[in-house]
Amino acid sequence: MSNMQSPPPEVLFADELAFLETWDAGTRPKGFRMTASSVVTFLMGSRGEALKRPKSAGKKASGPESLVISPKFVGSRALVERSVITLAGERGLLLVGEPGTAKSMISELLAAAISGTSALTVQGTAGTTEDQLRYGWNYALLLAKGPHPEAIVPSPVLTAMRSGRVARIEEVTRCLPEVQDALVSILSDRRLSVPELSGSDPHIEHAGLGFNVIATANLRDRGVSEMSAALKRRFNFETVPPIASAREETALVKARATRMLERAEAELKVDDAVLEAIVTVFRDLRLGRTEEGYAVEKPSTVMSTAEAVSVAASIGMSAAFLPSDRDVLGLVPGYLAGVVTKDDPKDRGRLLAYWDGVVKKRAEGKQRLWQTLHELRAQLEE
């Protein structure tokens, strides 16, 4: 794990997953490695309480007798519960929302908790082919022996069907409509026909118990294809909203930025007040209104929590690897300008208007941090 830039959840939280598999002896949905309530606990955490392993787990259960489960998703518990129940049935789960609202993270966590792996993944792009959702061929074996089962190269979806696990399809709406529709028969019939192997009897791959699909899609993104009505009917839709609480968003940004710096063997030396200011700016520009009630012109860029984490981590990296007497607050305008203007250069004007309005008003209110930020306005024009 030490050599991984971004360990998957089944590696990062291996101790928690192993503990939860034996913590609850209740009924498990077919194919689940733990109970549905344990899956919810894995995502939402145990609220700081140390869960105790029951005596009924027996001596075969290894690991600690009690464990605090860390919260991984900051959001609606009801959304997580509905998602888990969807996956316990025979309908796919489609997570939709603005970019950066943790849809991919939720799908990873759910797949890891339910199936033990989040690796059975297809990344949707305009170049994704039907083979990547169904199967391909080992052409050396195909030429040597002709069509036979050993020559099939299964897609992550077919691998999940065979093993009764959860497959993930990221940004499904980036796939072309004809490619998306390859999922219709898989999700409705729970089987996949391989006509190349069909002789007198058809060759059909049947989905094992526990198989399901989690797909994600961005609501505000360019270069996407509309899903067919037939495919939409095969999914239960869950909309993942941005984090409602500024305090919770700040805590999440700090935790994620800290984790990123730990992987770089560095320490996050950014004051909580600076992190709060970063999150406040992101929320103001994302929502189009400040907590004080001031109207703000929203940029075309989605000011997501993921982008806020990136800015906080970049400032932390700069402080760790380019140490100087300069206040890290002086780095904030430059990184903000990079985020705001990446989709439309005209958004720089909107950021400057925010500085001349909201930031100036806060500075006039004798808030020292905002006074310093207002004095750094010139950096936004560079």
Positions of PLM-derived features:
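Conserved AAA+ ATPase small/helical "lid" subdomain
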Residues: 77, 250, 256-329
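Amphipathic alpha-helical interaction segments
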Residues: 90, 117, 144, 190, ...
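C-terminal engagement/docking regions of AAA+ P-loop ATPases
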Residues: 320-382
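Short alpha-helical scaffolding segments that buttress acidic/His motifs in well-ordered protein cores
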Residues: 83, 278, 282, 335-336
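Exposed alpha-helical structural elements
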Residues: 38, 156, 248-252, 273, ...
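A diffuse structural propensity rather than consistent per-protein peaks
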Residues: 35, 129, 153, 168, ...
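AAA+ P-loop NTPase catalytic core and its hallmark functional loops
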Residues: 2-264, 269
